[in-house]
């Protein structure tokens, strides 16, 4: 055991939150990778392996629908300092649940670090927003609806689906990471 590293949390039991645009910028500008910004088919990339992280698919014909009680979220900017609590919080609500992610106010993700998750087939969006605002001091930024899905074929020869290209269950799941840990 490395005496300088103390981590009692197994990787499949913890999660990490990060701002996607900041991570992407950091990786692309690191100089560690040859970056070609273009709209390409992963099959045309000259590499031994390609990790397809292009986000949510436009066509869901190659995906299985996953059952989940929520299918929508209202994203908001908090009117308080979320950094006073250094871990994410999950609060049960009348319509589903709310997540609060401690996010630095300068981060592009700060405007969306509080999310009210609910089922739009049961609760109308205006009612969900009313309930959200009655429980939390936030400025609503946007409403999103989403599908819960997993790829039927996550690995196709040398192309490996990852992130939202592989799987989406709900806003706070790091689903693809956990899925690969379980498959391994």
What are these model-predicted stretches?
Residues 1-4:
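N-terminal FAD cofactor-binding segment of flavoenzymes
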Residues 104-106, 117-184:
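FAD/FMN-dependent oxidoreductases across multiple families
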Residues 11-17:
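Active-site rim elements
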Residues 15, 71, 165-166:
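Generic secondary-structure boundary/loop-capping signal
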Residues 18-136:
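Predominantly flavin-linked oxidoreductase catalytic cores and closely associated redox partners
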Residues 12, 85, 169-172:
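Residue-level detector of alpha-helix boundaries and kinks
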Residues 7-8:
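Amphipathic heptad-repeat coiled-coil/leucine-zipper-like oligomerization helices
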